[in-house]
Every structure is written in structure tokens, then in C-alpha cells.
Curated annotation (Swiss-Prot):
Chief localization: cytoplasm
Subcellular location(s) of the protein: Cytoplasm
EC number annotated for this UniProt entry: 3.6.4.13
Reactions catalysed according to its record: ATP + H2O = ADP + phosphate + H(+)
Entry protein name: ATP-dependent RNA helicase DED1
Coiled coil spans: none
InterPro entries, sorted: DEAD/DEAH_box_helicase_dom, Helicase_ATP-bd, Helicase_C-like, P-loop_NTPase, RNA-helicase_DEAD-box_CS, RNA_helicase_DEAD_Q_motif
Domain Helicase ATP-binding residues, every copy: 176-365
Motif stretch (DEAD box): 309-312
Cellular component GO terms, alphabetical: cytoplasm
Family membership: Belongs to the DEAD box helicase family. DDX3/DED1 subfamily.
Region entry Disordered, spans: 1-53, 543-617
Length: 617
């Protein structure tokens, strides 16, 4: 093992990962796995292509245990029995009537206790008890300390228990009482801190307790073909949207709430047919939601809850006109008549000023800072010239013991080239970027999550929001130009209180990020290599624009601008309610893509409708 490899050792207690091979492909092939542009990966010396067509057996799709979403072997809604019938709850005479329990469905949704692909989000959350929290605004409700009824609905508590969530995260401790009191919320929390549960738990709990909004008068055929969701969740990428939908299915189990997901890159016809069966909670990317609104397939008149996840990225990267059209120009109830929740890792001043138009009498919640990840993520910065990166990468992978490794590059071309290189070196690798079709992206993510491909090469499309359990090593093969994007990337490991390693290849081409990188390492009490200090002195002396690598002072990115001279329209008074003192910092970003929202792609995938069967939700 070379000196470079010895610089990065995996955390103690991690075992070498065993490769599970699904039964239907154990005796496969003799040909080499698919090359990177087709989304495949090498399987230990050419045991066969993983993404081959297995016909009616369903393949290794997103149904997971025995088939795809519509395969004849089962999955979510397979021919051996869907999730329909008495397992759906109902709202009858002002009361919520839960559906019947079903062990098979619970295994599909929540997994077996020993199944690593259904990682409990309660693992190591004791590490988060000391994270500082600051809540500002008028009459901030008292935080909860455990999952109880009240304030949460009893059915939701049962589903939370099935998901093996043992205690709320800091953001959930505040978001639950805030939403239950009918308040709007702007939540700024570190990545991996349970933001998805932070809005799903209170929104679903209140929906279970209060039921759907009263629908408009039936106008005939068009009414039957239009969805009237009670809650709308918008996310910037299709990957994040499908991930939220995957979680929503768990917590909507046995309830009257039927979740749906819509996003670009998949056939819109399948998504519309799925909504025809009911849509109470709609998870959507802004582009596809606008399309459905223009087609008259969705009405927002019944929306009680609007959630903007990764809100800073959606607004900052160009989605503001689409979001404003959805919120202000369509039939959504106005501000004050709905609850609006905005969740992200940072809210810089300019984003907060844009967001104020969507919020009313809101509470600003800031949870943690960059330094709070110091116990979970070990950051290593290596000086590597561009010509030496491949060699250094092989050294790191040789020391990784087949653990899940996520490698970030800056360009789509490099993602494919590097994946092909790793396959030629007999590594099981696959790639995800914006030029891949939706089917290829979903297959790549499925392979990586399952461990069949233990290396995923990604561009910024996978940098935000994705929650992939058991990623133990993140490698920044190419450092981003914005320090906040670096923070989001390394946040793919060390999630849910678990430990991980983040390695970055640095050279003189990265001087634009050196100041922010130095500050992050210093705040997190990480080792700062001497070459980084030298580069910082050079950059500071030459004034070569290091300040452009961050959006002003990083500490302001998690602070409520109303408390620091902001001219917001919601009043100037604020009250603090905190565990310890908030320390600023946090996770965020202002650059990077959000994926390709073009038409085309594959039928099926996460949440896509299957024409043979109907799903329980």
C-alpha cells in the first residue's frame, strides 16, 4: 500500500462488505459487464452484465425483494398481489379509519431488521443531542424530545416505529410543534440531519388528524381526471423527488393519504395515469408540475401544505420563475391560507429575501454548523496534480475494503471516462450524471445502494439531497468551485450519525476554494495540511479573488436575516429558543446542476405507473 493510501484509513469497526448476488443472476453470463455509458459495471472479472433483461422475472428493479415495480415476481403492485384493498385507510364522517396491517407490505416498505439497505435513521443519533439549535420568531413553540401522541398522530407513530426511528433529530424536535401550531417554517439544517422527516412527519400527522380539504363541486369528466393534492412537496432534482416519495410511502402506510411523484425524464403519461388513481401528497420537480398544471391534470386549490425542499438551490439556480408561477399564478391558496415550509442546508440573505414572499409569520430554525460534523466525517486533503489523480485514486480504493465509495467529478465526460477506467481496473463501478437517461440513472443508483456496484462516479446531479445509506467514503476527484458544494458533497457520508471519510484531491487549480476550504477544516477541528496553509497565504497576498469562493460570511448562511438588520416584511421582533448557542455555518451551495429535466427516459422506475397493475398507494 502506498503512502497516499495509508493517509486514508476507514473508521474502526467497519467490516469488509460482502457482495450479495440476487438469485436470478447468480449463474449469469460469461460476457463482460456493460461499459459506463450504458450504466453498467464490472462484476469481478466478467460474471455477466447486471442490467440485462430478465423478462417477466422483473429484473433487479426498484421493487428490490424479488422484482421490479410491476414484475410478475411481485414488488410494489406485482401480479401476486398489490398493496390495495383493505390496506388503504379512509376518511369517513370526519374520522381517519386506518387500513389493515400486512406483513408482506411491511417487509417491502420497511425491510427486515437485519437488512442493511433499510438503515435505521436512529443509529448514533445520541451524537446529535449536543448540536446547537436556534429558533427565532414570535412565540416559538416548545420543542419535543421524543415521538409521542400528541402531538403526532398515533398511526404515524406506528409507522415511525416500523421504520426504526427511535428519537427525533434536532430539526424534527422543532418542526413537529411548529407545524402543529399552524406556523410557517424556514428550516436551515445540516445535511443528513433528518430534514425529510422534518417536514413529512408533521405534515402527515396533521393530515391524518384533520383529513382532506373539501373538494370543489364535481364538474363532470374533467373532475375525474384532475388531481387535488392536500400537500405539495417541490424538490430540485428527480433523484431527490423520488427519494422523498420513497420515504412518504413508508409513513403513509395504512392511511388515507396516497402519495405520488412526478418528474421530468420519465413518461408523463404513466405519471398522469398514476395520479388518476388518487393523489393526496404530490412530490414534484417544478418543471414537471408546471407541465401538469398547464395540461389541467392538477389543481392546487385544496393545498394545505406547501413544502420547498432544497429551497435555496431551486431559487438560486433558476427555478424561481417556475415556482412563482406555481405559487402565485395558479389556484393555490394564498400566503396565510396555507402552511409553507422551506427546508435546506443554507439560506443566505438574498435567498431569504426571495423566500419571504412565500412565507407568513414564519419561524426561522437554524440547526448545527459545519463543525458539528467533526465527530462523524474525517476530512483529508491530499495534494495531487491532475496527471496523478488516477494513480492516487487507485491507492485510495485499494484501502477502502469494498465499502461504498462516492467519487465526485466536475464534468459528465469525466464521469464516463473515469468509470470506464475503473472498470478496466476490475472495480465494480457505475456513473450518474445529467446526460444519462432516467432508466440508466435509476439502475445506477439501485446498483450502488444494493452494493452490487460499490463505486459511484457522480457529477453535481447527485451532490444534493440524496440519502444513500452506508456510504463510508466520499472522494472529491475534482474539487468544486464553490465551497458550499464541497460541504454538500462530503455530507453524503457520515449521515444519520454514522462515521465516514471524505478525501479531496487539491492542487493549484483549486486556489479559488482554498480560503473556504481552510475555514471548514478549521471549524470542524480537522487536520490542515501545510500545503493548504501555504496556498492560503499566497492567495491572500495576491488578492486573487478568494472571496468569490463563498457567498459572503459563511456564518450568515444559517442566520435569520430579520435579526441582523434585514428589511423583511414580517416584523422586526424575534425571540430565541435554543439548545446551546447557534454557531452559524451550515451546508449549502450556489453552483452545480440539478439534473437533466428533459423528456424521454424509461417507463417504470421510482413511482412510475405500471399499466398492468395498480399500486396500493
Amino acid at each position: 500500500m502506498t503512502e497516499l493510501a495509508e493517509q486514508v484509513s476507514m473508521p474502526e469497526g467497519q467490516q469488509r462488505r460482502g457482495g450479495y448476488v440476487p438469485p436470478h443472476i447468480r449463474n449469469g453470463g460469461g460476457r463482460r459487464g456493460d461499459s459506463a455509458p450504458r450504466g453498467g459495471f464490472n462484476n469481478g472479472g466478467g460474471r455477466g452484465g447486471f442490467f440485462r433483461n430478465n423478462g417477466d422475472r422483473g429484473g433487479f428493479g426498484f421493487g428490490g425483494r424479488g422484482g421490479g415495480f410491476g414484475g410478475n415476481r411481485g414488488g410494489f403492485g406485482g401480479n401476486r398481489g398489490g398493496f390495495g384493498g383493505g390496506m388503504r385507510g379512509r376518511w369517513v364522517d370526519g374520522k381517519h379509519v386506518p387500513g389493515q396491517r400486512n406483513e408482506r407490505i411491511e417487509l417491502e416498505l420497511f425491510g427486515a431488521p437485519e437488512d442493511p439497505s433499510f438503515q435505521s435513521s436512529g443509529i448514533n443519533f445520541d451524537n446529535y443531542d449536543d448540536i446547537p439549535v436556534e429558533a427565532s420568531g414570535e412565540d416559538v413553540p416548545e420543542a419535543i424530545t421524543e415521538f409521542t401522541s400528541p402531538p403526532l398522530d398515533s398511526l404515524l407513530l406506528e409507522n415511525i416505529k416500523l421504520a426504526r426511528f427511535t428519537k427525533p433529530t434536532p430539526v424534527q424536535k422543532y418542526s413537529v410543534p411548529i407545524v402543529s401550531k399552524g406556523r410557517d417554517l424556514m428550516a436551515c439544517a445540516q445535511t443528513g440531519s433528518g430534514k425529510t422527516g422534518g417536514f413529512l412527519f408533521p405534515v402527515l400527522s396533521e393530515s391524518f388528524l384533520t383529513g382532506p380539504a373539501e373538494k370543489a363541486a364535481n364538474d363532470g369528466y374533467s373532475y375525474q381526471r384532475k388531481a387535488f393534492p392536500t400537500a405539495v412537496v417541490m424538490a430540485p432534482t428527480r433523484e431527490l423527488a423520488t427519494q422523498i416519495f420513497d420515504e412518504a410511502k413508508k409513513f403513509c402506510y395504512r392511511s388515507w393519504v396516497k402519495p405520488c411523484v412526478v418528474y421530468g425524464g420519465a413518461p408523463i403519461g404513466n405519471q398522469m395515469r398514476e395520479m388518476d388513481h388518487g393523489c393526496d401528497l404530490l412530490v414534484a420537480t417544478p418543471g414537471r408540475l408546471n407541465d401538469l398544471l398547464e395540461r389541467g391534470k392538477v389543481s392546487l386549490s385544496n393545498v394545505k401544505y406547501l413544502v420547498l425542499d432544497e429551497a435555496d438551490r431551486m431559487l438560486d439556480m433558476g427555478f424561481e420563475p417556475q415556482i412563482r408561477h406555481i405559487v402565485e399564478d395558479c389556484d393555490m391558496p394564498p400566503t396565510g391560507e396555507r402552511q409553507t415550509l422551506m427546508f435546506s442546508a443554507t439560506f443566505p440573505h438574498d435567498i431569504q429575501h426571495l423566500a419571504r414572499d412565500f412565507l407568513h409569520d414564519y419561524i426561522f430554525l437554524s440547526v448545527g454548523r459545519v463543525g458539528s460534523t467533526s465527530e462523524n466525517i474525517t476530512q483529508r486533503i491530499l495534494y495531487v496534480e491532475n496527471r496523478d489523480k488516477n494513480s492516487a485514486l487507485l491507492d485510495l480504493l485499494a484501502a477502502s475494503n469494498d465499502n461504498l465509495t462516492l467519487i465526485f467529478v466536475e464534468t459528465k465526460r469525466m464521469a464516463d471516462q473515469l468509470t470506464d477506467f475503473l472498470i478496466m481496473q476490475n472495480f465494480s463501478a457505475t456513473a450518474i450524471h445529467g446526460d444519462r437517461s432516467q432508466a440508466e440513472r435509476e439502475r445506477a443508483l439501485a446498483a450502488f445502494r444494493s452494493g452490487r456496484a460499490n463505486i459511484l462516479v457522480a457529477t453535481a446531479v447527485a451532490a444534493r439531497g440524496l440519502d444513500i445509506p452506508n456510504v463510508t467514503h466520499v472522494i472529491n476527484y475534482d474539487l468544486p468551485s464553490d465551497v458550499d458544494d464541497y460541504v454538500h458533497r462530503i455530507g453524503r457520508t457520515g449521515r444519520a450519525g454514522n462515521t465516514g471519510v471524505a478525501t479531496a484531491f487539491f492542487n493549484r487549480d483549486n486556489n479559488n476554494i482554498v480560503k473556504g476550504l481552510y475555514e471548514i477544516l478549521e471549524e470542524a477541528n480537522q487536520e490542515i495540511p501545510p500545503f493548504l496553509e501555504d496556498c492560503l497565504r499566497e492567495v491572500s497576498f495576491s488578492r486573487s479573488g478568494s472571496n468569490r469562493s463563498t457567498r459572503g460570511n459563511r456564518s450568515s448562511n444559517t442566520r435569520d436575516y430579520r435579526k441582523h438588520g434585514g428589511n423583511g416584511s414580517f416584523g422586526q421582533n424575534s425571540r430565541n429558543s435554543s439548545w446551546g448557542s447557534a454557531r452559524g455555518g451550515g451546508f449549502g451551495g450556489s453552483t452545480g446542476g440539478w439534473g437533466n429535466d428533459r423528456a424521454g427516459g424509461s417507463a417504470g422506475g421510482w413511482g412510475a405507473s405500471n399499466t398492468k397493475t395498480s399500486s396500493w398507494w
